[in-house]
Amino acid sequence: MKSTSKEHSIHLFGGETTGFSCEESWNGIVSNEQEHAAKLIRQRDQESFIVARSQLRKQLSERIGVPPLAIEFKQNAYGKSSLVDFPNVHFSLAHTDHAFVIAITNDFPVGVDIEFQHRKFDLRKIASFAFTSEEQTFLNELNLGSNQQVEILKLWTQKEALVKCLGTSLESGMQSFSILNEQNESIQDFLQIHQNEHVYSLISGAWLPTFFISVACESPDLISPLILFQNVSNPLFRCA
């Protein structure tokens, strides 16, 4: 595979929220983010949101040279965030129970998703809007139990990461493409998808003992981008 320079890369920063100070993180977000956090019912959801948003501001600040609390975001019609004054800086944020991950790149649109590996998905509830008919058939033919749950988790995170990269809604975007290979018989840890006359790369893997991450990016040259890790003690994957 052709090598990739650091200038053509995705930087991932992530961690477990228990490793960060909630008080310090609270002071690292702006008032509308604090208001959003206060509306969340579960304390762990509040903590994950507060830590993730403050770390997003910190990481973007180091890249663009703007103080964290001065960074301004805008959103498209589907809620995808971008920077007001730095259109070439692309980022994506995902958080789940006690963990978060941030993807940042200067090169291309990017999306990331993280899920707790032992999260239980009810296939019947999500299949109708999340998976194509081929994907539903594939999952239904798997043995019930751990194998099906692992494949649902992999499929879900890959599709959500790509939808975030595309900047569309989950409901309208997830069924517009299939993650399965051409034979509709397996879900790959690395794959490329043609969507809307563009090429997107997807890569997935386990991180730490209990989390699963997928990253999607627009990859016009059919080259897997270099994944660079910052402050993550257990690297997820590295492609070059």
Segments and roles (model prediction):
Residues 1-240:
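Core catalytic alpha/beta fold that binds nucleotide/phospho-ligands
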